[in-house]
């Protein structure tokens, strides 16, 4: 019998989840919930239906896992605990500093209802977090490094779009090659924010806008650009559509450490991602963890979980014997 999946929110992430379900025969999409008028939302799966979010509670016996595809700033802190009262839930909450409090609120709701809520699933947090944990457990004497990119940062692109005189924009985060090489060589450098990444902006300005002012507003923006070397390019709307319409991303998690009685041997563990579509990859991770949530809940587990709490075998459609035979 298929694991029945619901999607809450049908933007880039929700559409990505729908595509990922197509590639997982043991999963079945039964419902998409939206804040928009349901009749205006066209989905790709003919056997599923679109409902208003207000109807979610009526579906709680028809859905095994609800994948919540909202934003981390305002949606997920409310939605994940709320829907954990009705369903097993998965989210991609990625505000790193606020993960502990988000975990606690989801944990309380999920324990009370007997459901599981796996939070902060994706690639960072998510796959990168797992690789940090494995590397730290193995090389206890060492240093962690995370590099992001080259890729489009949605949050930074939005921040540029909010500047007066900006019609549209894309921002790329780019690792500094010399810093990456130093880490890979086991040099264990101490790197500042500015030494690890640069930022590159492609901006379509409103007609008659002050370009020098826009560039200054970008480069001096606190929390986003002021700590980085930033390059700003002004381009036409056509160029932006033609050359910058994708949502690629990726990055590297590296731990460099020493072993031996006198720390005489160096080791470098590296995990990297190169993604054509950030939301579609994130969605694929969410779907694997939906399978895990269903299985863990069937075993009687409840409460909030993170990727650290999920044994790898729960993620795969294959059973233990198959995994031991083919992947071990």
Labelled PLM ranges:
Residues 10-11:
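Glycine-rich Rossmann-fold phosphate-binding loop(s) that bind the pyrophosphate
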Residues 93-117:
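Rossmann-fold NAD(P)-binding glycine/threonine-rich loop
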Residues 127-143, 158-168, 292:
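Oxidoreductase and adenylate-handling cofactor-binding alpha/beta cores
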Residues 4, 15-16, 23-54, 152-290:
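C-terminal substrate-binding/catalytic lobe of Rossmann-fold NAD(P)-dependent oxidoreductases
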Residues 91-92, 117-121, 147, 170-171:
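General beta-strand structural signal in soluble alpha/beta enzymes
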Residues 267-328:
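NAD(P)-dependent Rossmann-like dehydrogenase/reductase catalytic/cofactor-binding core
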Residues 56-65, 73-92:
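Rossmann-fold NAD(P) dinucleotide-binding segment
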